[in-house]
Structures are given as C-alpha cells and as structure tokens.
Amino acid sequence: MSDNMEFPTKRMRRLRKSPQIRNILRETRLHPSDLIYPMFVSEKLGRGDVEAIDTMPGQFRYSVDDAVSEASRLEDEGLSSVLIFGMPSAKDELASAAHDPHGVVQRTVRRLKEETDLVVMTDVCLCQYTSHGHCGIVVDGEIVNDETLEVLSRIALSHAEAGADVVAPSDMMDGRVAAIRRSLDDAGFQDTLIMSYAVKYASAFYAPFRGAVSSAPAFGDRRSYQMDPANIDEALIEAELDLREGADILMVKPALAYLDVIGKVRERFSVPLAAYNVSGEYSMLKAAIKSGYLTDEAIYESILSIKRAGADLIISHFAPDLLGVI
C-alpha cells in the first residue's frame, strides 16, 4: 500500500463529514420503482370488507374492489408494481379455481389494468387453491411434477389473458418455466414476462404468509420441491435452468437470510434479479419495532441490504412504509 493510502494522509472520515457529502457518495440507493408490493385478494370478501392479517401486522386481505382502490392509492404515492395473490371461495384437489377466467386474480388483474398504470404481476401456484395445500397435484400421497406443469400453464395463461404483465411461478416444479413459456407463446402472449421463483428455499420464514392465505400443507412439508437452506451451488443450477427455459427475471426467496445467495446469483448472471422479503422477515421486524427493541429505521436498512446484495427488484410487505421515505 502506498504512503498516500495510509493514515494520516488517508482519512476516511472526510467522506462522512456532512449529510450532503454522505449523500453524494452513497453507493446504494433505493427508489420506489425498486419495490413490488404483494397484495392478498379474497373471493370471499365484498366491497369494504378488509380483513387484518393477524400474523402480519399492517397487512390486509382485500376484496377485488378494495385491492384496486388500495393499489391506486399507492400508485399515487409512487408505487410502480404489485404482485397479486388470490384466495378462492372454494378449493379442490386440482386447483380448478386457479385458472378460472372469472377467478379472483383474473378479475383483479383486469381491473388493475383498466384503472391504473401499475406493472401487474401475478403469483402462479396451486397451494392457495388446493384442498391439500401443496403446490402441485397429489397422486397417492406424492406431489407429481409433470402432471402439475399442465395446470401451472393453464393458470399462467389465464393471468396473461386477463392482462398480467408478468407471471411469477412459485411452485418449484421442474420444467415449469419452459412449460409456461411454451403455453404463453403458443397463445400469442410472447410479450408476457416470466419472473421465476428460481431459487426458493424451504424456509421457516414463510409461516405468517401461510396463515394469511390459508395455504399450509395438510400433510407432510414442501421439502421435496423447495430447496434445502444449506445449499448455494444448487441455487446457481436452478437459476441457470430457469434462464435456459425462458425466464426473464430471476428471484431469490427469502431475502434477508439469503443475502449471500442473492450476491452469488447477481455475480453469475447479468439478468434482472428480484428478491422476496418474505412474511417472516416482515413480521419479526414489525414485532421488534412494536416492542421498542428497534426503530423504523431498521426497515429501510434491511431493505437497503437486499439492494446492496444485488437485487434489482424487491418484493416486500414494507413497500407502503418505504414509499414516503425513499
């Protein structure tokens, strides 16, 4: 190291001496366009019937009307994107309601595209729609992969037909991106993007979400299709496979406990990268803030760390909290 890189010649505190200097030298910045807000829309609710989610303070289940109103309000505050999760009034073993053209997600998407300029993304999965709560078709107690692909393709196509800009398969079945891309292209939806939950771990941090949408599995767990939290090389293989199959955007989920994975995926692939700041990460921060152990500044810092790790887009329940801050 040369002499001019040593103290007292080199003084790093010069770079931090005022808010103005710190601001112009800041390496990582959050912008409202970085944020995607996940919204829960229930077919069982009517206009004005907004349900608080006990496991996720400050989050709600909305009717179609109220979801559109809330999304429009947040758009006025700077939000650019939403990710829609549906909750049907009836479930069955084959997730039939998930690809109903008049289903809750499909109706919400149509309204959002008519009444807002938001980028509308949709979650493509079976778990909220199956009576058993698994993300795939079950045959003799086994989650079967290839039979599930046809259902996923039908769901994604129904979302595209409703006007979704981006479909986001979250099931973790092998080959789902290729199947969905083929289905969309064959139907003339070549311009519909796929944001793949490429690297989705079998995480304990999903627990509040499963309570929010009543999607906990009725038997077993999801470890036969979601990834082992111990693995990182596998994450790179999953990401590459999804890119080869036609994914436009990759996603890592969860985010905060997997910042190293986000960094590795960012380093390897020069494609748009999303990260999901999941329900457990949200709820534990909310609980700590409510108890006085942390301040609201921890929200900004945690989301900033996801951006710094390499994510271009951040799906977060904190989006409304951040719109007035960043």
Swiss-Prot record:
Cofactors (names): Zn(2+)
- PROSITE patterns linked to this entry: D_ALA_DEHYDRATASE
Q: Which residues bind Mg(2+)?
A: E238
Assembly and oligomerization: Homooctamer.
Name-wise, this protein is Delta-aminolevulinic acid dehydratase
A GO MF term: porphobilinogen synthase activity
- List keywords of the entry alphabetically: Heme biosynthesis, Lyase, Magnesium, Metal-binding, Porphyrin biosynthesis, Zinc
Pathway assignment reads: Porphyrin-containing compound metabolism; protoporphyrin-IX biosynthesis; coproporphyrinogen-III from 5-aminolevulinate: step 1/4
The role this protein plays is:
Catalyzes an early step in the biosynthesis of tetrapyrroles. Binds two molecules of 5-aminolevulinate per subunit, each at a distinct site, and catalyzes their condensation to form porphobilinogen.
Enumerate the InterPro entries for this protein: ALAD (IPR001731), ALAD_AS (IPR030656), Aldolase_TIM (IPR013785)
Which positions does UniProt annotate for 5-aminolevulinate 2 binding? S279
Cofactor, free-text remark: Binds 1 zinc ion per monomer.
Q: Which residues bind Zn(2+)?
A: C125, C127, C135
**Enzyme Commission no:** 4.2.1.24
Q: Which reaction does it catalyse?
A: 2 5-aminolevulinate = porphobilinogen + 2 H2O + H(+)
Where along the chain is the active site annotated? K200, K253
